[in-house]
Amino acid sequence: MNEADRKQRNQQRLTECFPKFAARVDAVIKDLEAQGIRPRIQDAHRSIPDQIDAFNHGFSKVRFGFHNVTGANGKAESLAVDLLDDDHPLDPPRKYIILLAGAAQAHGLHPGSFFGLPQSLRAGLSKAIQDQNFDPKIKIGFDPTHIEATGLSIAEAKAGKRPT
């Protein structure tokens, strides 16, 4: 995707997010861009039918998630985004995954690179993020380009709670 289209897409997708979450995602994007990376928000808000389809095809483990959150009158208030490396959208390098996780954590967000990892492997990933170690022996969770809000559960978000 050309640079102008990538930036326009990111700005449009940020409007699908809850404002405080969007500001954090924007900061993550800026951090990665400062390192010469071209992050692209692939998905922010996702409709319930699209979420069910993702669940049914094994791309999600939940039928309702942070991507599906809405506010008053059904306004999109996503609390998750899938942030791809625009130069490697189908096969993100380990370096990108580790740098994305570090930037997400630095801005109070939770990276999907931890999803599905037992505690014993989470420690190794945390150390890799801290040390910016891109070693292929480090295990990565099942949704490495996903980042989401912290401090609330999916059920709380569905019931109307939002991050502060």
Language-model-detected regions and their locations in the chain:
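An exposed tryptophan-centered "aromatic clamp" motif
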Residues: 64
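Active-site acidic/histidine clusters and adjacent loop/turn architecture
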Residues: 1-43
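Catalytic cores and adjacent binding grooves of peptidoglycan-active enzymes
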Residues: 67-164
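N-terminal-biased segments
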Residues: 1-3, 20, 43-46, 50-58, ...
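Residue-identity detector for glutamine
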Residues: 8-12, 35, 42, 51, ...
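Extended, low-complexity, intrinsically disordered C-terminal regulatory tails
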Residues: 29-61, 111
